[in-house]
Amino acid sequence: MRTLWIMAVLLVGVEGSLLEFGRMIKEETGKNPLFSYISYGCYCGWGGQGQPKDATDRCCFVHDCCYGKLWSCSPKTDIYFYYRKNGAIVCARGTWCEKQICECDKAAAICFRENLGTYKAEYESYGKSRCTEKSLKC
C-alpha cells in the first residue's frame, strides 16, 4: 500500500491533469488506470516509441499526438474541469488550453472503453525497451 501511495504522489507531480484523466478512465472503463494503463504497450504512460501493440495502445499513441498539437499549452501540468451530462463527458470552464487538454483526455478515455474487448493483460507493464520497431509519426 505504501508503494502505491508513493507511486501516486510521484505521478501527480508528473502530470497535473493526471487525476482528472485517471477519473475519466475509471468512469469509462471500470479499470484502475494506475494498474491498467500507466505502462501498457509502447505508448501508454510516459513517452512512447515503436509501433502500438494493439487498439488500446493506439489510443495512447493518438493521445500523445493530441497533446503534441497543443504546443502552446502545458498538458502535463494544467488542471482542467469536466462533468457529465446524460452520461457524456463535458469539458467545461477554464482556459482554451485546459479545455483542449480535457478533450484529448476525453477522446482517449472513450477510446479505451471502445477497445476493452481487445485489451490484453500481456501488455500491462510492457517495457518500452521492447518497442524497437520504427516509431509512427502523428
Swiss-Prot record:
Keywords: Blood coagulation cascade inhibiting toxin, Disulfide bond, Hemostasis impairing toxin, Hydrolase, Lipid degradation, Lipid metabolism, Metal-binding, Platelet aggregation inhibiting toxin, Secreted, Signal, Toxin. It catalyses: a 1,2-diacyl-sn-glycero-3-phosphocholine + H2O = a 1-acyl-sn-glycero-3-phosphocholine + a fatty acid + H(+). GO terms for cellular component: extracellular region. One of its GO terms (biological process) is phospholipid metabolic process. It holds the Pfam family Phospholip_A2_1. Expressed by the venom gland. This is Basic phospholipase A2 Tpu-G6D49. It comes from Craspedocephalus puniceus (Flat-nosed pitviper).
